[in-house]
Amino acid sequence: MKRAILLLPLGIFLIVAVFLFRGLWLDPSELPSALIGKPFPAFDLPSVQDPARRLTEADLKGKPALVNVWGTWCPSCRVEHPELTRLAEQGVVIYGINYKDDNAAAIKWLNELHNPYLLSISDADGTLGLDLGVYGAPETYLIDKQGIIRHKIVGVVDQKVWREQLAPLYQQLLDEPEAR
């Protein structure tokens, strides 16, 4: 009995050490999303540049698209912005979600840095971000023609991320036949 009591702390230590050691090989930027394979959450939000124009989840259907969560307060969003602009110029459909931001600042940002978005919506109170499980900005979702979330990137979408992760999936979604 005394021996078991003495070995218990050692056993607990070994179990904790194994989990900590295993964690050294995990990618901290890889944050799984429970929404992969599920429809984009329902929303009805105004456009940043024209609040009378609204976008809903139904508007995301028809073509594969990127949905990019961004904010003027986000330094990493500024880093990825030129790549998003390049992709939009190549015909990639990109929607923006301006997350917890001031609308006037967002309009100024888009006017100064160019607007890569087919439409960017204002999620000023963060409700859609909460439904998406947003950890912060930038985050980018790849959705298919039916509005199903197929992939999520947490962090900057740069040329490497586009080339290695998103472009192959995007092309695959473009090549899929229409659902009947």
UniProtKB/Swiss-Prot annotation:
UniProt cross-references to InterPro entries, sorted A to Z: Periplasmic_diS_OxRdtase_DsbE (IPR004799), Redoxin (IPR013740), Thioredoxin-like_sf (IPR036249), Thioredoxin_CS (IPR017937), Thioredoxin_domain (IPR013766), Thioredoxin_ResA/DsbE_sf (IPR050553)
Membrane topology: Single-pass membrane protein
Chain ranges on the Cytoplasmic side, renumbered to this chain: 1-4
UniProtKB keywords: Cell inner membrane, Cell membrane, Cytochrome c-type biogenesis, Disulfide bond, Membrane, Redox-active center, Transmembrane, Transmembrane helix
GO annotation, cellular component aspect: outer membrane-bounded periplasmic space; plasma membrane
Membrane-crossing segments per the record: 5-25
GO biological processes: cytochrome complex assembly
Periplasmic topological domain residue ranges: 26-180
Cystines in this chain: 74-77
Protein location: Cell inner membrane
Chain's role: Involved in disulfide bond formation. Catalyzes a late, reductive step in the assembly of periplasmic c-type cytochromes, probably the reduction of disulfide bonds of the apocytochrome c to allow covalent linkage with the heme. Possible subunit of a heme lyase.
Annotated protein name in UniProt: Thiol:disulfide interchange protein DsbE
Organism of derivation: Pseudomonas aeruginosa (strain ATCC 15692 / DSM 22644 / CIP 104116 / JCM 14847 / LMG 12228 / 1C / PRS 101 / PAO1)
Name of the encoding gene: dsbE
